[in-house]
Each structure stands twice: as C-alpha cells, then as structure tokens.
Amino acid sequence: MSNWLVDKLIPSIMRSESQKSSVPEGLWHKCPSCEAVLYRPELEKTLDVCPKCDHHMRINARTRLDIFLDEEGREELGADLEPVDRLKFRDSKKYKDRLSAAQKDTGEKDALIAMSGKLEGMPVVACAFEFSFMGGSMGAIVGERFVRAANVALEQRCPLICFSASGGARMQEALISLMQMAKTSAVLARLREEGIPFVSVLTDPVYGGVSASLAMLGDVIVGEPKALIGFAGPRVIEQTVREKLPEGFQRSEFLLEHGAIDMIVHRGELRPRLARLLSAFTHSPSPVSA
C-alpha cells in the first residue's frame, strides 16, 4: 500500500496541481449581471459586452479611446501634467499616498486621458475618464486636461467627444476641485459660441460634480445601456426623501424616457453612429464604413 501511495497517487496529485498553476490568470471573467463565466479573449471581441445578457462592463480609459479612435494619427494631450497635493490634505490617508497608490494601480498620472486623432477619417478630440483612478474624480489635472482638449478642438475646429465615468469632484482638492466645474463649463461655452460640436457619452457611472457640469452640457448626450447617471446616489436620495424610488431610477433608459439624454447607443455601434452624427454636424462627407 505504501509503495502505491508513493509511486502512483502522490505524483498524480502533484501533476494535477502543476497543471492548475499553469493556467494563466485572468483567462476567465464572470459577468456581474448574469454571472456567466466568459472566456476573456472572446469577451474582448465584444468590447467587454456580455454576449449572454448584453451587460456593458466597465472598461478603462485607454481601452475606450483605442476602440473609438482610428489607429493612425493619435496624439495624447496634457500627458506631462501631474497632480500636486497643494493643500496637504489628509483623511484616513494622506492625499499624496492615495495618488501614489492610484498611479501604481492604473499606470496613469490622473483620472482623465485626452487625445487628438481621427474618427473614421474625421479629425476629432476625445477624452475618457479612468474610473479606477480614485473613482474618476475630477481635480485640477482632470480639469486642465479637459480644457486643453477643448482648446485643441477650438484651434482645429473639430468635434470634441468626452466619455464620462466619475464619482464627481475630488474632495481631497476641496475648492480647487469645485472650481473645475466652472472651468470646464466655461470652455464648453466657448465651443458652443464657435459652433463646434461637443458630444458627451455617459458610461457607468456618472455622478456628482462631473454630472453637474461637463457631462450634461453636450450638444448631444449619449448614454450606454443601463449606465447609472445622477448627482447623488439612489441610496442617499432614498434616505433623504424617505420614499421608494421608481424602478430603474437613474439608469440611462430612465433618463432617456424623461428627456435628460438624447439617445442610448450600444458600445459596438457607438463608433459608426457618432461618425455619422458628427459628419452631419460638420457638413463632412459621411464615412464610407458607417
């Protein structure tokens, strides 16, 4: 019996454990909506939209810009800008430590990435919030990058598109972060005066100071399916008004029904749909592939 254990069973267990450890991490992903277990390479083909239930999963800012902009001619804007802890703010942690941790986790300097490029051959400027960086909160660098992107759109007289995913203003920057609401709104007013289109795409989630400023100031406001959009969260509102909120409250479908946004577009259709829309705005020839 002892020989059988040593010669057969133990080597078999060791081989099995070795095979388990050789499976790459992150190869499978569970849908947070329907809990289907999905093969990661196949999920990437659907742009992180569940093929079983059509749930639009959160994606990072660079991935979003990669799938939206043409491959050629991209130029990142404001990449040299880095956040500074001017107030020496501290809550349960020092702000500078939170920044360092977020930068290490995401590989980004702050919560907004801006790029000039092309959309099906049409010059555009696009921005995307990185929700994984301190909840996509808007501080001085986010505001400055957005303004620089808008200024490039003004100089080139081309459309500006912003993909919002944010919890709101960054509390660690206090009044400096609140000032970004006015700063971004002011530059969007200049775009409107010049007749340059701004398309705001609301992804899951958009709250607080971002929803109360740039996110809701688009000439066209687009929502991704079932994105949460509001100022305060539904639980906070329920506790305040002490009433049960309507079914689907703050979902993009609810906002569309009540006239707060203009359309809901599936992620896979967003690129050609916006290309057609912007060609109409700018009186450019419609893209052939659209």
From Swiss-Prot:
One of its GO terms (biological process) is malonyl-CoA biosynthetic process. Zn(2+) binds at residues 31, 34, 50, 53. It is found in: Cytoplasm. GO terms for molecular function: acetyl-CoA carboxylase activity; ATP binding; carboxyl- or carbamoyltransferase activity; zinc ion binding. Its main location: cytoplasm. Component of the acetyl coenzyme A carboxylase (ACC) complex. Biotin carboxylase (BC) catalyzes the carboxylation of biotin on its carrier protein (BCCP) and then the CO(2) group is transferred by the transcarboxylase to acetyl-CoA to form malonyl-CoA. Acetyl-CoA carboxylase is a heterohexamer composed of biotin carboxyl carrier protein (AccB), biotin carboxylase (AccC) and two subunits each of ACCase subunit alpha (AccA) and ACCase subunit beta (AccD). This is Acetyl-coenzyme A carboxylase carboxyl transferase subunit beta. It comes from Pseudomonas paraeruginosa (strain DSM 24068 / PA7). The lineage of its organism: Bacteria, Pseudomonadati, Pseudomonadota, Gammaproteobacteria, Pseudomonadales. The gene is accD.
